[in-house]
From Swiss-Prot:
DNA damage listed as a keyword: yes
Source organism, top-level taxon: Bacteria
GO process terms (BP): DNA recombination; double-strand break repair
Lineage: Bacteria, Pseudomonadati, Pseudomonadota, Gammaproteobacteria, Pseudomonadales
Source organism: Pseudomonas fluorescens (strain ATCC BAA-477 / NRRL B-23932 / Pf-5)
Listed name of the protein: DNA repair protein RecO
Task of the protein: Involved in DNA repair and RecF pathway recombination.
GO CC annotation terms, alphabetical: bacterial nucleoid
Length: 229
């Protein structure tokens, strides 16, 4: 067998759309990064596998940015998501499509994504899972910052007020202004103590601020799902 023969790798479908006649253009998450590939005969058996939250083994062919799917098989049990857990999974997928550079390996992101899907399927509380995923994604992409110290390296004061300097860190301020975080909330986030009053809502605000600059001002469609009655 040729040493250049394609090797199957683990993957999840992030998004799929019709492409030309019976094909589909599919965005995959793999340990080697986000890959885009053409899936032939998408209306057949392969098309039934090419759906979100199903662990797959996929053989990609081609050296260009747009690959071709040579082989695709199930690699485990799908995470069956319903209701807000489903919306949460779609939110994770959209985040990865928007933030993860093509063909930039991030195996830790892949592993955390798979673990988060399982936790969503088990019915675990959504907000801590989403905040943890957002935080780890930012950190793995090089956009992370400390939660227990400010941009000057000083420890976060429980009675202090802080603002986020995006991609730099937290800066203490001494005048009230919109979008601030108090020290007790930040220290609770650092310890992942979601039982602390205000910690989860503050974490949601913090992650929105941190993500906004990297989303380029375009809203996430999946966020609207949570607002529908």
């Amino acid at each position: 067998m040729s040493s250049n023969a394609p090797v199957g790798q683990l993957a999840y479908v992030l998004h799929s759309r019709a492409y030309r006649e019976s094909s589909a253009l599919v965005d995959f998450l793999t340990p080697q990064g986000r890959l885009r590939a053409v899936l032939r005969n998408a209306r057949g058996k392969a098309g039934t596998l090419a759906r979100p939250f199903v662990p797959l083994e996929v053989e990609f062919r081609g050296r260009g940015e747009l690959k071709n799917v040579g082989r695709m098989e199930s690699a485990g049990i799908a995470a069956w998501l319903n209701g807000e857990a489903l919306f949460s999974g779609l939110y994770l997928n959209e985040l990865l499509i928007r933030l993860l550079p093509a063909e930039d390996p991030h195996p830790a992101v892949f592993d955390h994504y798979a673990a988060t899907l399982l936790a969503l399927a088990e019915g675990r509380p959504l907000e801590p899972l989403l905040r943890a995923f957002e935080w780890r994604l930012l950190d793995d992409l090089g956009y992370g910052f400390a939660l227990d110290s400010d941009i000057h390296g000083a420890p976060i004061a429980a009675d202090g007020l802080y603002r986020l300097q995006v991609d730099a860190g937290l800066e203490q301020v001494f005048l009230l202004q919109p979008g601030l975080f108090n020290g007790t909330e930040l220290l609770a986030m650092a310890d992942a103590d979601w039982s602390a009053p205000g910690a989860l809502s503050a974490a949601k605000r913090l992650m929105r601020q941190a993500l906004a600059v990297h989303l380029g001002g375009r809203p996430l469609v999946s966020r609207e799902l949570f607002r529908k009655p």
